[in-house]
UniProtKB/Swiss-Prot annotation:
Top-rank lineage group of the source organism: Eukaryota
Protein name: Rhombotin-2
Gene from which the chain derives: LMO2
A single MF term (Gene Ontology): DNA-binding transcription factor binding
Entry function: Acts with TAL1/SCL to regulate red blood cell development. Also acts with LDB1 to maintain erythroid precursors in an immature state.
Native organism taxonomy: Eukaryota, Metazoa, Chordata, Craniata, Vertebrata
Species in which this protein is naturally found: Bos taurus (Bovine)
GO cellular component, one term: nucleus
């Protein structure tokens, strides 16, 4: 379960987003430090208001209010994506090396197969693929366009 983080501003020249912006800043209390929020910018998440520095992952402490970050909230814990996946994500197996892929690792997918980034390479020449490279999936083997004919011949497919 992920939650949206809203950025709010107390700039009087801006039109109010909701009724909270019409309240004096001293009435807003931070969900983290429990102090009044007098800052111009603050965050709203989990039905509470936060100083930008107070909204952080309960495990690793990284700031969750930064642009591009996502807040996951489960079992009363505020978590970053990596810690959420580490605790609640499902691990899998790489289709190439049969070793464990942790839920938070970056992977490549082809149809129903999942690969470590370092395992996503041509089975014939071992070249790693770049964006736009063409390849063929043969069973769990990935073969680059240049090696398809040779690979299928060697493996008795022609």
């Amino acid at each position: 379960m992920s939650s949206a983080i809203e950025r709010k501003s107390l700039d009087p020249s801006e039109e109010p987003v909701d009724e909270v912006l019409q309240m004096p800043p001293s009435l807003l209390t931070c969900g983290g430090c429990q102090q009044n929020i007098g800052d111009r910018y603050f965050l709203k998440a989990i039905d509470q208001y936060w100083h930008e520095d107070c909204l952080s992952c309960d495990l690793c402490g990284c700031r969750l209010g930064e642009v591009g970050r996502r807040l996951y909230y489960k079992l009363g814990r505020k978590l970053c994506r990596r810690d959420y996946l580490r605790l609640f994500g499902q691990d899998g197996l790489c289709a190439s090396c049969d070793k464990r892929i942790r839920a938070y690792e970056m992977t490549m997918r082809v149809k129903d197969k999942v690969y470590h980034l370092e395992c996503f390479k041509c089975a014939a020449c071992q070249k790693h693929f770049c964006v736009g490279d063409r390849y063929l999936l043969i069973n769990s083997d990935i073969v680059c366009e240049q090696d398809i004919y040779e690979w299928t011949k060697i493996n008795g497919m022609i």
